[in-house]
Amino acid sequence: MLQLRTLGICAATAAYGATGLPALADTVWSADTSRSAVSLSVSHLLVSKISGAIPIASATVVTDEGALAPHLVDVILDSASLTTHDAKRDADLRSERFFDAAHHPTILFESRRVTETGPLTFTVEGTLTMRGVSRPISFDTRIGALRVDGDKRRVRYEATGRFRRSEYGMTYARGIVGDVVTLDVVIEAVN
């Protein structure tokens, strides 16, 4: 999926440059998956929260050359490795009742639009696909620190978004587990 989007970006860049207009200059950043993570939380019995993490399998952030503001973000999560540090609950969350990781081992986010909301803040709108269902979602995003690490540059993106699990077919235990799931995303991108 990421390869198709990257090819699409390259094709669009080539076509744009072929018109005699200035060519687009993009910088492609890739997530350092060992330093990137998605945390999730949902209310439980109306008085507590269940928290967990879903590993980022890969993520790509595309910016204009020399800029850090994203204009394209793609993220693939490994739902089969979701963890809440409770083996029984993790097995339940990976089951057909919730994420159905056996049939849908990945969760995909593809951005559609990025709107600047401040000097280092953005709203990233896109499509979240899980359990075979694609729905719109938006993330409040901010750019963290930029640092140089040898010959590589690293930038930190932090984002928060919410979705209703029932919209993805996760209706089990609705009176016990809340419907609104909060995702807190940290991507350390490298170029």
Task: Indicate residue ranges for each PLM-predicted region.
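Bacterial N-terminal signal peptides that target proteins for export
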Residues: 1-10
